Amino acid sequence: MKHTNLAFAALAAATISTGCNRGFDPDSEIGLVSREDGSGTRSAFVELTGVQRKAANGKKIDETSPATMVASSTAVALTTVASDPSAIGYLSLGSVNDTVKILLIDGVAPTREEIAAGKYALVHPFNVVCRDSVDNLKPAARDFLDWILSAEGQKIVEQAGYLKVGSTPPYTGKNGVSGKVVCSGSSSVTPCMEKLKEAYEKTHPQVSVEVQQSDSSTGVSDAKDGVCDLGMASRALKTSEKNSGLVAVAIALDGLAVVVNPANPIVSISKESLRAAYTGKITRWNEVK
């Protein structure tokens, strides 16, 4: 992996004990890993951490350092951090596995309880996007969405490691619904949608749900152009997208996990430190405060 000229501020030096962390060098430069432009996960991260600023004319500017390693998907971000002791990145909490270590943010862990209590700072919605109104969806797509938002669907959301959204009425459903539903977009939303697809198809054998992974912007565009029934986005719609007639429906809440290689001894980092690192204000692990 190509290293950046950036570093990460985290806990005080007392949290670092390198003797048992073979492969980690506190004097090394940090390998920052970011998602690509178009990723809803990136959009949420830069907004929530302050890496994105608003110019005087109101335009939003993403100040992620150009030296940052850009990962084209959740899987690439995960494997990149897992393979480099000095790397750090961010991804959907539901996509984390034991090849990386999750950092606390300002001492708070991204647990379901902390997210629900509003204590964890990096939280974003998983949305599905359609044109005009959900009432205009074809019957199979509308039924699938109704099922996702029901108690049955939201149970699957929670079992997959995410938080349910709002009240969860029982599923009433439509008799005899059939056909194909195409979902397209975010690689962060994809694992959750795959679980929902699997459970829905078991009880609706006449409906086929196809999940196409790309990124949030592609999912939004596909929904607008009628390429898919439901776009998948791990961010809110932009004003221009809303003005084009698109609507978003939240199907889950997800924590953004900031992850490092297991060899890294740091356990917690502040939002301010994340902002400073991803904008290039600090450059080495030994600058940790």
Where are these regions (language model features)?
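Bacterial N-terminal signal peptides that target proteins for export
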Residues: 1-7
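Hydrophobic alpha-helical targeting segments used for export or membrane insertion
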Residues: 11-12
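Exported/periplasmic ABC-transporter solute-binding proteins
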Residues: 20-289
